[in-house]
Amino acid sequence: MARNRICGKWENEAKTLRIQISTQGNDFIAKIIWFSDTEGKPMNYWKDKRNPNPKLRNRTILGMSILRDLKYNDKKGTWEDGIVYDSRHGKEWNASANINKKGQLKVRGYWHFKWIGKSMIFNRLK
C-alpha cells in the first residue's frame, strides 16, 4: 500500500540518527532508535532537558517520538500536517515528508510556511 511506504527504519545522511516510522491509527509517527554520541555516554543518558514542559525533561531521547500526526495525502503521494520535535532546542515545528525518486525520505520541518524551514534526508535501512 502506497501510504505505508514511509514505514520502516531510516538513517539520516550524516549517519548520526536512526528513526523508525510506524502507524498510529491513521497517522504516522517516528521514534528515535539510535543516535551518535560524541561524548561517549550511553544513549539512555541523554534526556529531553530543553523541553518546554518541565514534566517531560527527564524522558530519555532514545525511544522518544520526534515526529507525529503525519497524514498521507493520496493525491500528492506525500505525508502532511505533522509535527516534528527538535529536542536540541525544545521546539515543535510543522512537518511534511515525501519519498524522492532515489527512494530517500525527505522530512521538512517548517514554521507555518514550507519555504521557511529545514529538511533532513534519510536513507532506508535494510
Predicted regions and their residues:
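Residue-level detector of short, conserved catalytic/binding motifs and their immediate flanks
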Residues: G8, F28, L105, M120
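C-terminal terminal-subdomain/extension
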Residues: N94-I99, Q104-K106
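N-terminal helix-cap/turn-to-beta initiation motif at the start of protein domains
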Residues: M1-K9
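Edge beta-strand at a domain terminus
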Residues: K102-Q104, W111-K126
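A mature extracytoplasmic/lumenal domain signature
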Residues: A14, T23-G25, W34, I99, ...
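Central antiparallel beta-sheet cores of small beta-barrel/beta-sandwich binding domains
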Residues: C7, K15-D86, G90-N94
